[in-house]
Each structure stands twice: as C-alpha cells, then as structure tokens.
C-alpha cells in the first residue's frame, strides 16, 4: 500500500534512484495506491549527469509493493520492496531498461512497453 510520503525505489535507468509519493492519480481522495496505479512523485535521490534532477516532480507507475497482491486464482504475490517506473505524459517509460520482476497485471492496464522491457514477469 503506497500512500503520500511513502519512499519508493526506482526500477529503471531513467536517472532517478529514490522517489517520494506525493499524490495518487485517479479518484479525488484515494488513500492507497497498488500495483499498476499512477502516482505523482518527487525525486529524492538522482544519479549525477542525467536528465532527471533531484526535487523534480514526475509521474510514475507502481510495479512492486510489499503489500500482498491477491489474484483471482488464489495466488498471493509479495515483493521485498516498493518500486516504481518513471513515465511520461503518454504513459511510456522514460528509461530504456527495467530492473527486477514486475507483476503480470500491468499488461491488462496497458503498460505493455514496461512489460516488454522487464526481465521477469510474475
């Protein structure tokens, strides 16, 4: 469960390392974000000499959460960290590589470019 002020790892090579969620896109007063939700975040830590800088406000999609994800077939998936991928206004990833496993649910949410770049889809 991701809520405002939650710190996230970045699962791509866009240049950001750590994000902090500041708003959940969707309903006006949603409290928590889950896998596949788009959030507004601020960059807390960035790699030097990259296009993204610290304190820049960006959008990101959640790809991993520590909170369990329950599927219709009864399977429960839980990750070790909270992670997101930086996206642009057209919902395409800003990076060219994705690190770590991501959930299959992103394919149904039309994040097919992220799914195709991922090394492992659970």
Swiss-Prot record:
CDD domains: Ribosomal_uL14. It comes from the Eukaryota. It is found in: Plastid, Chloroplast. Signal peptide: none annotated. Binds to 23S rRNA. Belongs to the universal ribosomal protein uL14 family. This is Large ribosomal subunit protein uL14c. It comes from Morus indica (Mulberry). The gene is rpl14.
């Amino acid at each position: 469960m991701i809520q405002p002020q939650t710190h996230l790892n970045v699962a791509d090579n866009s240049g950001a390392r750590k994000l902090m969620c500041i708003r959940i896109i969707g309903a006006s007063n949603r409290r928590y974000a889950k896998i596949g939700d788009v959030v507004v975040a601020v960059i807390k830590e960035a790699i030097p000499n990259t296009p993204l800088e610290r304190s820049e406000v960006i959008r990101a999609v959640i790809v991993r959460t520590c909170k369990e994800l329950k599927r219709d077939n009864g399977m429960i998936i839980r990750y070790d960290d909270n992670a997101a991928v930086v996206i642009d206004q057209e919902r395409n990833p800003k990076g060219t590589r994705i690190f770590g496993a991501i959930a299959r649910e992103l394919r149904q949410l039309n994040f097919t470019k992220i799914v195709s770049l991922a090394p492992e889809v659970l």
